[in-house]
Design a protein with these regions (language model features):
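Cationic, low-complexity basic patches in intrinsically disordered or flexible, solvent-exposed regions
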Residues: 20
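Extreme N-terminal basic, low-complexity initiation segments
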Residues: 1-9
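Catalytic core of non-heme Fe(II) oxygenases with the double-stranded beta-helix
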Residues: 157, 182-281, 322-329
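Non-heme Fe(II)/2-oxoglutarate
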Residues: 41-68, 101, 116-118, 232-238, ...
């Protein structure tokens, strides 16, 4: 019976039922307090595409993120789930209006740069044909509602309680307004920010509702535990290079490139076949909260819309007592620029 009903009911209807009766324990395992994780059939979902590859939608290869709204204030349980899953996703954890306030300021900045189509409301984030969009970290600077959302209030309170001590955050915000096309390749975050502690966490923030078509983040289930497969990748530094290798010196120092890109693969299905587990995602809404660690393999879905921008950010948090990666602190963090490069004798 559960499989039959989950096939008939759409994903959205099941979410609606959970919202109407958040405290009721239904006899069907996919419908309890919005926790519609693995028992839900994937037969009703659209075909998911990541980096140009169609994902296998079989229930043993694809699923929905675990919603931890039922444990939002139980940090002992959240730590347990983080250790088990490698991530924490809490639907509706943040005030939707505050997230949309940040979106409003972001789209105003995009509009001022001539990126948005003037025939549509700015809040719709419809890209003008031919406009340059994508990685926009500079737009996070001085964006008061975004800075307040990410670096004060409920977000920082979460990490303070999760770590059970004082925290600090990176001074750099990875803001993106991604148009139609391929999503982000499978990767882990540590190769880009591993010079300090390895216990820091990423917060991925959607600034608006993100359908499967618009393309949100996806994570590879259990990948944070596969150190056997990650050991030759995870501890590399994208800004490191061999001083005694003339080709690397030219590529990294002279040309400002990377000795390696930090990409794990260009093929999400192949990564899943190698690591096992399932690719997990959901349809995100403004106010949703997703955080994960440095060893978790993740990627993003392709933006399959005609002209809409998917607006999101990455921000990072850690214990204040632990060392921090110098590339991401200060009024003007050096990042992956010339001052962020590190030469080694290989």
């Amino acid at each position: 019976m559960p499989n039959l009903i989950s096939t008939i009911l759409s994903h959205r209807i099941m979410v609606y039922i959970g919202q109407l009766y958040p405290k009721v324990s239904f006899p069907f395992p996919f419908c309890y307090n919005l926790n519609i994780l693995s028992p839900m059939s994937t037969a009703t979902l659209p075909q998911i595409i990541s980096y140009g590859h169609e994902l296998d939608m079989s229930e043993d290869k694809f699923g929905i993120l675990r919603d931890s709204a039922d444990a939002a204030n139980d940090f002992e349980e959240l730590r347990r789930r983080f250790d088990e899953d490698g991530y924490i996703y809490i639907k509706g954890y943040l005030e939707r209006d505050k997230v949309l306030d940040a979106r409003r300021e972001i789209v105003n900045r995009l509009d001022n740069e001539g990126i948005l189509d003037p025939d549509y409301p700015a809040m719709d984030a419809i890209a003008k044909p031919g406009a340059k969009h994508g990685f926009k970290p500079e737009m996070a600077n001085g964006c008061v509602p975004l800075q307040e959302l990410l670096y004060s209030g409920k977000v920082t309170d979460f990490y303070r309680q999760f770590y059970a001590e004082d925290i600090r955050h990176y001074d750099y915000t990875w803001l993106r307004a991604l148009g139609p096309g391929k999503g982000t390749n499978p990767h882990c975050d540590l190769p880009y920010m591993g010079r300090g502690t390895h216990q820091h966490m990423t917060c991925w923030m959607p600034y608006g509702d993100i359908s499967y078509e618009l393309g949100g983040l996806m994570i590879l289930e259990g990948s944070h535990k596969r150190t056997d497969l990650l050991k030759n990748y995870i501890y590399r530094d994208v800004d490191g290079y061999c001083e005694n290798d003339a080709k690397q010196v030219k590529k990294v120092v002279d040309d400002g490139g990377w000795s390696f890109t930090g990409t794990l693969s260009h093929n999400p299905p192949v990564v899943r076949n190698k690591f096992g587990g399932r690719w997990l995602t959901t349809e995100f809404e403004a106010g949703d909260f997703l955080t994960f660690g440095m060893f978790l393999v993740h990627a993003s879905l392709d933006n399959q819309t005609e002209n809409r921008l998917r607006i999101s950010s990455d921000s990072r948090y850690q214990r204040a007592s632990e060392p921090i990666d110098e590339r991401w602190v200060g009024a003007k963090p050096p990042g992956h620029g010339p001052n962020g490069k590190r030469g080694l004798i290989c």
